[in-house]
C-alpha cells in the first residue's frame, strides 16, 4: 500500500497533467506491483492529514523490536481539494498498486492555466480566459508554475533527512531534485554527514519521452528514453482556438488497440568508472481493444446501418508484455501480466543470465473483494455514519440525495444505494525457491490496514520446523510478518 505522501504526490502529478506511464522507468510497473510487493515486517502506524488543499502532514511510528518514527510535510502550489484525503473515503485501488491500464499517448496540455481562473461559476468566461491565455503567452498574469515541496525527517539516530522538489516549468517538462542526508554515527562523529543529491529533468511530448539525471553520489550521469510506435499524437489535432474554446481533453491517437514502446537507459560515473546500460520493449493492449464503448466516441464508419457502425471488441482480457535486456551483465527478463477479470490479475516473470546460466521464475496474483452495496440514507454528506440522516433529510436539515442520471435510468441501481467499491485485496507471489509472500490489504472501519507474511527456506542458524514436523537446523519458516495501519483525516 502506498504511503499517504506518495498518494498525494500521484494526485499532484494527475492534477498537473503529467503522464507518469510514458517513461522508461515505469516500463515494468505492472509486473513489479504484482510480483515485487513488500510485506510489513513489524507494527507500524501512520497518521496523516490534508489539513488544507495545499498542505499535508504525516506522522509515522514503528515498534516491535525497534522503535522509530518519522515526520513528513508536503506543500503543493496546486490545490488538491478534489483529492479524497480521509481514509474512509480514499479509494483502495488508488492506494494499492496493481495491474495498470496504459492509455494511448497524448499531447501534454497546459492544464495548469485553469488554476489562476479561480472557482468562477461562469464556464464561458473561464473558457474565454483560457483561450486568451493560450493566444498571449507573454501575459504577466499567467499561472504560477506547478511546484511541490516534500520533506521527511526520520527521528531515531542516525537521523536521516529526505527532501523532494518538483517543478513544472512547461507542459512538457518536469524537474525533480531529491536530497538525502544522514547524520554521522557515534563511532564516526568527526566524519562529515553523508549527503547526496539526485537531479532529474523529464521531457514528454507524447510520442517520446526523455530523462536526464545527475547524482552527486559517485558523480553519476544518466539518460533514459522511451519511444512509442504508431501515430504521432501531435499530428492528431490539438487546441481548437478558432472557435473560442480550448479542448480540455488530451488529444490521443484514435482507434488504437495496442501500444508498442521501446526504450533504454545508460549510466556513467567518471569517478568510479562504472557503466550501466539496459534496453526494453513493452507491448500492451489499450482500452479500445476490449471495450467497444471506447469506439463509440470515434468518427462513424461508412457502410454501416444508419451511417455508423460500432466495431466489436478485439481482445477479451487486457494484458501487458515486457522484455528487458542488460547487455553488460547478460541479464534477460520477460514478464507477462493479465487482467483476467476486474477483480483478478495474474503475472509471471522469467529471468535468465547468459553468462552464469542462472534463471529466475516468479508468479503472482491479486484478488479483489468488493464491498456490498450500502444504503446512503444512513450517511451524512461528509461520509460519516448517522442512523438519523434519513430523518434529517426529511426535515430539510441535510441536502437530499442526488437523483440518478437519466441516461442510466434503465439500470436497476437505486440512487439511494452506493455503487460497488473495493473493500480488500489479497496478493500472493511465489518463486522457484518456494519463497512465498502473502499480503492482505483492506479497510476496517475508518482504518486502512496492511497485514503480510513472508515464508521461505531458512538458513542453518535459524531454528525452524522441518518437513518431518520436528525441530531442525534447516527447514521452512516465516522470514517476516507485520501489520501496518493508516489513518488520515
UniProtKB/Swiss-Prot annotation:
It is found in: Mitochondrion outer membrane. The keyword DNA-binding does not apply. Pfam families: MDM10. It comes from the Eukaryota. One of its GO terms (biological process) is mitochondrion-endoplasmic reticulum membrane tethering. GO terms for cellular component: ERMES complex; SAM complex. Its main location: mitochondrion. It is a multi-pass membrane protein. Keywords: Membrane, Mitochondrion, Mitochondrion outer membrane, Transmembrane, Transmembrane beta strand. InterPro entries: Mdm10. Lacks alpha-helical transmembrane segments, suggesting that it resides in the membrane via beta-sheet conformations similar to those predicted for other outer membrane proteins and porin. PANTHER family: MITOCHONDRIAL DISTRIBUTION AND MORPHOLOGY PROTEIN 10. Component of the ER-mitochondria encounter structure (ERMES) or MDM complex, composed of MMM1, MDM10, MDM12 and MDM34. Associates with the mitochondrial outer membrane sorting assembly machinery SAM(core) complex. Belongs to the MDM10 family. Component of the ERMES/MDM complex, which serves as a molecular tether to connect the endoplasmic reticulum and mitochondria. Components of this complex are involved in the control of mitochondrial shape and protein biogenesis and may function in phospholipid exchange. MDM10 is involved in the late assembly steps of the general translocase of the mitochondrial outer membrane (TOM complex). Functions in the TOM40-specific route of the assembly of outer membrane beta-barrel proteins, including the association of TOM40 with the receptor TOM22 and small TOM proteins. This is Mitochondrial distribution and morphology protein 10. It comes from Arthroderma otae (strain ATCC MYA-4605 / CBS 113480). The lineage of its organism: Eukaryota, Fungi, Dikarya, Ascomycota, Pezizomycotina.
